[in-house]
Amino acid sequence: MDRVAGQVNSRRGELLELAAAMFAERGLRATTVRDIADGAGILSGSLYHHFASTEEMVDELLRGFLDWLFARYRDIVDSTANPLERLQGLFMASFEAIEHHHAQVVIYQDEAQRLASQPRFSYIEDRNKQQRKMWVDVLNQGIEEGYFRPDLDVDLVYRFIRDTTWVSVRWYRPGGPLTAQQVGQQYLAIVLGGITKEGV
């Protein structure tokens, strides 16, 4: 019985991975159950054995990704000594997500605003608010403790970091000439060059 359950879970994971790649490449509205089933070499009805709809697949993909991301963020905030190191950790965790959860990041970037209006995806707006608070708190702490310039508009800096980081998923491809860590380190150097206090 456990072996059968393991095979079902493994197949479910394979189908989710395939669906994620298709959603990221084509968009949610342009990807049908039939497309995913064809890509998996199964009949559409067989896909319904695993998932009730494409929305269920998207929900599982986004929830899993956001749960992973926020666990990483929380670990960094809870275990890192100072605001500068916390900011660096959050920044690099975001690029880690782009490397290892590329399709989910693309889906999130392309579809989150539209999906957030649906009750099933109400958690997206909650996560956006949590993310903003986490980053803004770190920036404010950095100003208070003398790591970051006191004249910064924290909300503007947060928006810049968020948009600069996550939009890189548009051009960055895992397995290309640069790793996400290399890109993240370059981006981080640019950001820190603009926000850190002289002498830090």
Residue positions per predicted region:
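Hydrophobic/aromatic residues within well-ordered alpha-helical segments
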Residues: R11, T54, L61, F65, ...
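Hydrophobic alpha-helical connector segments
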Residues: E60, R74-Q104, V154, Y158-I161, ...
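Amphipathic alpha-helical segments used for helix-helix packing
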Residues: E99-P119, R170
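C-terminal peripheral helix-coil segments that are non-catalytic and often amphipathic
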Residues: D2, A93-E96, H100, R132-E145, ...
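Short coil/turn segments at alpha/beta junctions that flank glycine-rich nucleotide-binding fingerprints
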Residues: E25-R29, T80, H101, E145, ...
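Helix-turn-helix
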Residues: R3, E14, L18, M22-E56, ...
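Amphipathic alpha-helical packing segments from all-alpha helical-bundle domains
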Residues: D67-F70, R74, H100-A103, Q118-E145, ...
